[in-house]
A protein has these predicted regions:
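Terminal substrate-recognition subdomain of acyl/acetyltransferases
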Residues: 1-2, 84, 108-111, 117-181
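A short beta-loop-alpha structural element at the N-terminal edge
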Residues: 5-21
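Amide-forming acyltransferase catalytic core, primarily the GNAT-like/NAT-type
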Residues: 14-15, 19, 28-36, 168-172, ...
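Alpha-helical elements of Rossmann-like donor-binding domains used by nucleotide-donor carbohydrate transfer enzymes
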Residues: 18-22, 44, 98, 102
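Surface-exposed charge patches
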Residues: 21, 105, 127
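A conserved beta-strand-loop-helix scaffold within acyl/acetyltransferase catalytic domains
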Residues: 24-27, 33-60, 64-88
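Conserved acetyl-CoA-binding loop-helix of GNAT-fold acetyltransferases
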Residues: 86, 92-107
Length: 181
């Protein structure tokens, strides 16, 4: 239903039932947009939910609507806002913006002194990031931890990243520095 209320909130353990649906939608959405995205596993989504590092959107009837999660890097110096996805039938209703605001606030509350970054190829995410105070940066200004870059291996554009020595790719890196904001 179009007028059904959507609730955006921190994920709870019961939300692990959405993990398969979340990863399927992430992959199909990336294919439909023709953009690269690092593939996630259901286990990684469950891990984020169980660790209190995820935001979920659901209808009041318990239908999955959207998701995003955070991850820390370089010993907590950086936090990434990642995996923002909204189910196709609930897009263009402001859900992504609400999820983005919540995941940003979760990052700030859990890791107040960490720099927050987002790597995206989507204009909508770039606009949301800009509204929150993120600025475009080079890849050299975000996490350097090899584990972060290993996650890019499943992206269709990984060869571009490698050929550029992890200095740039087709995605835009955006950074929020709490010292400047």
């Amino acid at each position: 239903m179009e007028d059904e209320r959507i609730i955006v909130r921190p994920a709870i353990p019961a939300d692990v039932v959405f993990a398969d649906e979340i990863i399927r939608e992430m992959e199909s959405s990336a294919i439909a947009r023709g953009s690269g995205i690092s593939k996630r596993s259901a286990a990684s989504v469950i891990e984020k939910i169980d660790a209190g590092k995820a935001i979920v959107a659901v209808t009041e009837n318990g239908e999955w609507v959207g998701f995003s999660y955070i991850e820390t890097w370089d010993n907590g110096k950086f936090v990434s806002n990642s995996g923002l996805i909204v189910s196709p039938q609930h897009r263009n209703q402001g859900v992504a913006s609400e999820i983005k605001d919540c995941i940003f606030n979760l990052s700030r509350s859990k890791y107040p002194s960490a720099k927050i970054f987002s790597i995206t190829s989507g204009l909508a995410i770039m606009k949301m990031n800009t509204r929150l105070g993120f600025e475009p940066v080079t890849y050299a200004e975000v996490a350097r931890e090899p584990r972060f870059w290993d996650a890019c291996k499943s992206c269709v554009n990984y060869d571009v990243l490698q050929s550029k020595n992890r200095c740039n790719c087709l995605c835009t890196a955006m950074l929020f520095d709490p010292q400047l904001n």
